Amino acid sequence: MFVLLAAPAQAQGLAGQAQIDAAGDLPVLFDARERLARPDVSEILRLRFLTTTDFPPFNFTDQTGRLAGFHIDLARALCAELGMETKCQIQALPYAQLQDALEAGQGDAVLAGVAVTAALRQRFVFSRPYMLLPARFIRHRETQLPGGDAAALFDRPVGVIAGTAHEMMLKAFFPDIKPVTFETRETLLAALKDRKVDAAFADALQLSFWTQSPAAANCCRLFDGPYLSEKFLGEGMTIMLGPQGGTLATALDSALAALSRNGRLEEIYLRYFPSGLY
């Protein structure tokens, strides 16, 4: 799938409604006092973003078959901020093909939530983070706890998926909590729903959507947090560029900072996460 990035007419209205429905809570990742240089991008003939269609609400195809999602709207906003609306394109590929396509010059930037690793840094250039994905607790609504923060879970059973960064993070951050491990997210959430554990600790994005799903049956709600850790959860979501993309990465950093400061980044976030992650 391949499309030009023309901004949809309804975008501003959706963002305005989200602003009313939820308080903004997107962490600020760019210091207001920081001045980021913006290279001249006027000679760049086109800016080709690569993404996928299997990571809702970040990138997916809508009911009309068009690319949609947080990343699609972010790409449009970045292009507008850089004055490159008519030069921007976006193409969807299978996730497994993104790195090879970028190295082969089939695109200029990957906007698909790729996790930064030391190995990838040897092959690609990355922008600054535009979003951090936190860990959160979730509790059953009928479970009585002696407080409103994580201390209320001390000496209590809290479920977590075995062998994950969240298990290591739970043990490191909260040694007084009794971790109960599960092999899968499904068995973890089933145990929480059946009140076999007092709470669970996992990825906030997955928990947020589960609490609103029919499967949860309004049993549970997010509790305390958010908890962020580069050591356990990584650097956050960034844009991945080819090895010669340093100048473009600097330009995108400058544009991301501008979107953060003028509120546009938060508008896009609230459109797709009206209940918040933080």
Range-by-range predicted roles:
Residues 1-6:
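Bacterial N-terminal signal peptides
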